[in-house]
């Protein structure tokens, strides 16, 4: 059992039988009345973010989780197969339990979050930034840049993102996997 004084970002909680991890929290001590903690919690299963307020000092069930590095091997329909490099143990994760799945390619290292007591896989997260190759994009027209102009590009994983006009087919780009946005061109 943990109290609100133990809260930290990334901590996993069990609320009403569902697992959430803390995205953001703020201890508030108003001038009048008792202190409380305002939090933003992200559901492990659905990815939905909720806001919840706790009274200061309340005991909450903390869930012990472990983050383990796995190598992405291949995709079989909606199931993704991973292997741990040290033990060569293979596990699989369903597509809807992988954060940033549209930017995952074979050979990428992925963090899989596991419940420490029951060894069940909760979800998988790919790194925040991924370097991917553009396989198709329309050529940019010079002089067509009145504002911050972008165009649609298809990357090697099959996902489509918006990129600046100077990006061409075959260029390597860095993509933010949290929101699917272009970060920079990689040489």
Swiss-Prot record:
Coiled coil: none annotated. It is found in: Cytoplasm. It holds the Pfam family EFP_N. InterPro entries: Elong-fact-P_C (IPR015365), NA-bd_OB-fold (IPR012340), Rib_uL2_dom2 (IPR014722), Transl_elong_fac_P/YeiP (IPR020599), Transl_elong_KOW-like (IPR013185), Transl_elong_P/YeiP_cen (IPR001059), Transl_elong_P/YeiP_CS (IPR013852), Transl_elongation_fac_P (IPR011768). GO terms for biological process: peptide biosynthetic process. It comes from the Bacteria. Belongs to the elongation factor P family. This is Elongation factor P.
């Amino acid at each position: 059992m943990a109290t609100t004084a133990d809260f930290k970002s990334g901590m996993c909680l069990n609320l009403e039988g569902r697992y959430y991890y803390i995205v953001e929290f703020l201890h508030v001590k108003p001038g009048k009345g008792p202190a409380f903690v305002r939090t933003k919690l992200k559901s492990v299963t659905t990815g939905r973010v909720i806001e919840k307020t706790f009274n200061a000092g309340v005991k909450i069930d903390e869930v012990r989780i472990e983050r383990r590095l796995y190598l992405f091997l291949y995709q079989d329909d909606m199931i993704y197969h991973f292997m741990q490099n040290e033990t060569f143990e293979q596990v699989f994760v369903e597509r809807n339990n992988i954060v940033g799945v549209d930017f995952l390619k074979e050979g990428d290292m992925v963090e899989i979050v596991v419940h420490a007591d029951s060894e069940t896989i909760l979800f998988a997260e790919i790194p925040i930034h991924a370097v991917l190759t553009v396989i198709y994009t329309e050529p940019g027209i010079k002089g067509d840049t009145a504002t911050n102009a972008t165009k649609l590009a298809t990357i090697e994983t099959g996902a489509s993102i918006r990129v600046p006009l100077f990006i061409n087919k075959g260029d390597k780009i860095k993509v933010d996997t949290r929101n699917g946005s272009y970060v920079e061109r990689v040489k």
